[in-house]
Design a protein with these regions (language model features):
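Internal alpha/beta core interface subdomains
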Residues: 4, 17, 22-25, 91-148
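Short, basic, glycine/proline-bearing loop/turn elements
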Residues: 2-6, 68-73, 114
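Glycine-rich nucleotide/cofactor/substrate-binding loop typically near the N-terminus or early
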Residues: 35-104
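N-terminal glycine-/serine-/threonine-rich phosphate-binding loop
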Residues: 1-50
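General beta-strand structural signal in soluble alpha/beta enzymes
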Residues: 8-10, 29-34, 48-52, 76, ...
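Electropositive phosphate-/nucleotide-binding environments in soluble metabolic enzymes
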Residues: 10-17, 30, 34, 68, ...
Length: 148
């Protein structure tokens, strides 16, 4: 696996295009969630939509990146056995995960928040990807300021 792969899932899109350009200049292939890929495309940055790996988002966009394929690509160990299993199943290895979370604290601070609005701002897929990346010793970026 010569080319490195980065998974970008950004709620806050500020600076994500420049970050992706930097990764590409370092030899990374950039993968992303649909919204991130669409934003990058508008800025002229080519990225691969993970929907091609996991299918289109479902349940009102609640399930986007939660999948065996994404988790395995992040959690696989850098050993021949795991790499062979990824290859066998056509799963992409991810070297870097860049996720910023939905603004849950901001939503909770809004006096007009509702149970449903809080539920919608509770990030599951991003949290799962970040925890998997941390467990696997991958590069993890969670704050937009760290993309600069």
């Amino acid at each position: 696996m010569n080319k490195k792969n980065a998974l970008l899932m950004a709620y806050d899109k500020a600076g994500i295009a420049d970050f992706a350009r930097g990764l590409i200049s370092l030899g990374y292939a950039v993968y992303g969630s649909k919204g991130t890929v669409e934003h990058l495309a508008k800025d002229g940055v080519q990225a691969i939509d993970i929907a091609g790996i996991v299918g289109e988002p479902i349940l009102g966009h609640r399930v986007v990146s939660l999948s065996r394929e994404i988790s395995a690509g992040i959690l696989a160990r850098d050993v021949e056995e795991d790499r062979a299993e990824l290859t066998k199943h056509g799963i992409t290895w991810f070297d870097l995960v860049c996720v910023d979370f939905y603004p849950l604290a901001k939503e909770l601070a809004d006096p007009a928040h509702t149970k449903d609005s809080v539920i919608e701002k509770t990030d599951i897929g991003g949290t799962t990807a970040v925890r998997a990346a941390a467990k696997a010793g991958r590069v993890v970026i969670c704050e937009p300021v760290d993309r600069e």
